[in-house]
Amino acid sequence: MDADEANTRRDELFLLDVRQPDEYGAGHVPGSVHIPMQELGARQAELPTDRTIVCVCRTGSRSGMVTRALAQAGYAAENLDGGLQRWAAAGHDLQDAAGGQGTVI
């Protein structure tokens, strides 16, 4: 899913940020849920079964792997094309851990 579509549909989607805590703290999509990739198995119960999950990382590589795994497990899952780098380049907002303007690291 491209950044513009994800931004437009943000309220109906479950945005899952799979990056490391320091990356998430530096900048994330407001309202996204942070579950680092390595914790996903233990925290799978936190994922919705009634909404499309859009997986997010910096470039789309890690989130692409998570997207494939979730789809194989029966979830409606899509990858954010180009990750947060493309999201930010499209001019969409990012928030840091303190609630200020975020950045992609």
Task: Name each model feature, range by range.
Residues 1-14, 20-52, 61-105:
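Rhodanese-like catalytic fold shared by cysteine-dependent sulfurtransferases
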Residues 56:
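Short, surface-exposed ligand- or partner-binding patches at beta-edge/loop junctions that are enriched
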